Amino acid sequence: MKRVIFCIVALLLLLGNSAVAAVLKVKTPKRVEISSQAVKPYIVTIQCKAEAVKVSASEQWLGIVGEATLEAKATHSVKIWAEPNLSTTERTAEIELRGVKSGAVRTIIVSQPPYLQSITDGFPVRMMGSRYDAESWESCGICSPKGSSAVIAMVGTSGNALTTTSEKGLTVSGMGAGDYFLFAVPAENIKAGEQIDFMCTMTASEADAPKYWIFEYWDAGRWNGIESELRTAQQDSSIRYSLYNKRFRSAHNTTYAQSFTLTEPIDNGCVKVRLRALTAGSGKVKLTGSSKYISLQILRYKDAPKVSDTRRMLFIGNSFTYFYGTPFMFKEIARSQGHQVDVVASVKGGQEFCEHLQLERSIEAIVRGGYDYAFLQDTSPNAAIYADTHDPAIIASCRKINDLTLKHSPACQIIYEHTWGCPYGDYRGYGSYERLEQLLESGAKQLAKELSEYNIIVSPIGKGFTIGREQNLPLLHTDNRHQSREGAYMKACINYLTVYRTPFTESVSNCGVSPKTAKIIRQIAEQVVLGR
């Protein structure tokens, strides 16, 4: 009999606990709906009566701003954030409220309608300049590049009041740690193991913009970083970052490129990437829209051969490097041929070697080290000036940048770029294409010869431009000075062949150049470098 009574008491206690769990004393809405963009935090009023309550979200696209524990006997305005719903169907999640003492639970259903009407494959994404849907960005912090089905969004997880404006790019003010730029590209069928390349240019418009950022991509149900590529902040060893963005006295953009491979397939979904702020900053930060910079590029390598080797390459240069993103074109061409290239670039308009040696970002890029190749491009006329005057300051700067490069990358092969002639400034003051081109070529060769202890290779880009000009190829931009997209492709092809020394295969990428013109450019590049 005692045993029966004991069992009955135990059962009553169990039922009592269940009853407590069923009647958590809070007052909340049963269901909330947030917008498909969800740029601003949504406020949910929660009244805690008898005990403190812990708040959590059931899905990674949804989160709680600030403290996760609410005090008892108080009314709270809880902010929740959500990513845009980049799918074609409504989705739901739960906000769980759990009593700290009782363990009793109540849930709030959160629903979110879709942002996309349909999935239309958005690869490749190639953004130059400021071709964004600025009106959409300014109104709701989410937009698509013009002519693309890709999506760019601002996601605020910190609860800060974010301001989105368009000022020669996509600008955000007031970011807190954890807020992020989200990039998504609709994809109809991506197989497991397929590689994606992400490339962008970011700049700090004000001194107090967030400095440290981490790159992450969505795969296997979570956000993934690339641990091997992370660096440690000097002033705070707890900060492990992918890139840093800083306002310099003279603007110097952050140029970033990263490859990643998906372990799970995507069928009628989106490839998602984010740049997440690790430190807060009220100042303006933007995805640049400066003329002829790569603003954003996201590529997939659907039919590319497997990677046969991986090499790390440094690009130091000026506008003759950054117009149309020649380092990124090099990376794209190499991957289409089965070579993986990890790119680090420091590019700033008009810079000579001596000026790069005074730039924090250029020094940081060189000192990072571990490079297999370094493409060093002095300001374009310097080779011609050296051939004409033998200015000792030019060769002295060459020695200094070579020494710094090899100090941190002892096995690195240094490559100088023999650049091209142009009509600008009466052919740089030399009066004709022929005279300028002759000086540029002889000057590059003289520098390499007089610096023979460095075993420098000269990439004969200027020779390719000369042949292309004779064939009326549009290799110059409308300013008759910088490279056009076709000129950038010529430069990238010649640089590629200078490294790999093998002809192009049929799978080579055109990098956005028309197939017919791209083929002619490749033939010229092979003629110049390989003698074919």
Annotate each predicted stretch with a short phrase:
Residues V23, C48-K79, R222:
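Surface-exposed binding patches on compact interaction domains or structured appendages
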Residues T88-K101, V285:
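A short beta-strand micro-motif common to beta-rich folds, especially ectodomain repeats
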Residues P145-A192:
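Surface-exposed, low-complexity/disordered Ser/Thr/Gly/Pro/Asn-rich loops and linkers
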Residues G178, A187-M199, A204, D208-P210, ...:
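Extended extracellular/luminal ectodomain segments enriched in beta-structured repeat modules
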Residues A207, W223, Q235-A304:
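Terminal, low-complexity interaction segments
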Residues D309, H482, E486, A492-R532:
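Conserved catalytic region of serine esterases and O-acyltransferases that act on ester linkages
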Residues R312-L314, F320-R399:
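Conserved SGNH/GDSL esterase-like catalytic core that processes O-acyl groups on lipids
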Residues A365-R485, L497:
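Alpha-helical cap/lid subdomain in secreted, periplasmic
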